[in-house]
């Protein structure tokens, strides 16, 4: 079997394994049997190894890191998602992570293996602009950051689904253990009630007498079952942590790209569509992390912001290339 035939076998195998993985996780959500969850996790590991073997075979065939066209980048993205999946699953110990990540990985592999024309699946010599060591350093880091941010955003979307898009009061902290919530800390005073429930607050003057009564208002939170509340709390926390992992990767990838651009084109930043949307992506997730860390946001509001980030990542990765304009248009995906 030559390498081309092996690659064809491996991409079809990856599709079939991910299809089984998705169904296994979905069944495990309904019937939470330990052996079923372990089987689904094992199938995801097989899918990741299959994609790894595919990328390795392509590397041997082409002689360069396999991330030079849409087909290769899609499989690299799927590899990144399946790899980040295990980080999220280990952190959460929840079968719901796989129920969210397996469909997107399956969709990406299906698009690459079954939808792309044959000529777009074949390897080709690198264009001169890509013959650089920066290809691996910049593009691979960007793709891993996309995969990580997608997984974090998907978990945020799952949170919105579990909570039906309503405001819920979570028990965890937006910044992990030792964090604070919005409304609990103001200056040096602790307010155990905060703005969780309507209450009457006394405002004292200098004489010590109560001067006025003010009624504080808040949006009432819906009540979830203990199981759904625990799941929502887990999804919110893990989504935040995964996005916190992907954001520095995105930052490093953008900086590496700027250095490469200066070497190749004599300018660190050219404001072409890909660079502009990479900056927009960075700003969206910077706003997300800023809101969670400094404002104490939890639950619905940051989840909506992360969900919008999922769309922005796809536009940055794939959407702007449909324009066929800019310095990145030669790779159709870069």
Swiss-Prot record:
InterPro entries: Cyt_c_assembly, Cyt_c_biogenesis_CcsA, Cyt_c_biogenesis_CcsA/CcmC. GO terms for cellular component: plasma membrane-derived thylakoid membrane. Its main location: membrane. Required during biogenesis of c-type cytochromes (cytochrome c6 and cytochrome f) at the step of heme attachment. HAMAP family: CytC_CcsA. May interact with ccs1. This is Cytochrome c biogenesis protein CcsA. The lineage of its organism: Bacteria, Bacillati, Cyanobacteriota, Cyanophyceae, Synechococcales.
